[in-house]
């Protein structure tokens, strides 16, 4: 989770760069925003949202992945106005998140994680 000055606590996300896959973007953005090296374990799903930039409406689709890391080191990206970051237990993270769609993604990710553990795949 990341805390920024505009939106409160949010999950990491970003824009696909030319030649990148969604998976590569996810790994890069987590590294850039938190300094964390992660591996993708599963695709969770996608969400849509819209916002205004000046007089223009912007529509975004975000693809979400369940990832794992060997470290709990986390350094927020100050240049992007993130001023806190961290790893939290599911229930703590759920209550910190600002947006309902991100809470749903977290819930879906937790369900998937528990299933992978149950199957011996985590």
Regions found by a protein language model. Give the residues of each.
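N-terminal strand-loop-strand
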Residues: 1-12
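Unchanged
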Residues: 16-104
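Charged phosphate-binding loop/patch that engages nucleotide di/tri-phosphates or the phosphate backbone
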Residues: 95-122
């Amino acid at each position: 989770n990341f805390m920024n000055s505009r939106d409160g606590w949010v999950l990491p996300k970003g824009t696909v760069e030319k030649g990148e896959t969604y998976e590569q973007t996810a790994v890069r953005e987590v590294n850039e925003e938190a300094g964390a090296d992660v591996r993708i374990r599963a695709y969770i799903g996608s969400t849509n949202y819209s916002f205004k930039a000046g007089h223009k409406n912007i529509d975004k689709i975000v693809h979400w992945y369940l990832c794992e890391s060997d470290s709990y080191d986390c350094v927020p990206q100050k240049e992007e106005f993130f001023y806190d970051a961290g790893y939290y237990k599911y229930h703590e993270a759920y209550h910190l998140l600002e947006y309902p769609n991100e809470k749903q993604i977290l819930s879906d990710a937790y369900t998937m994680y528990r299933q992978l553990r149950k199957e011996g795949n985590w």
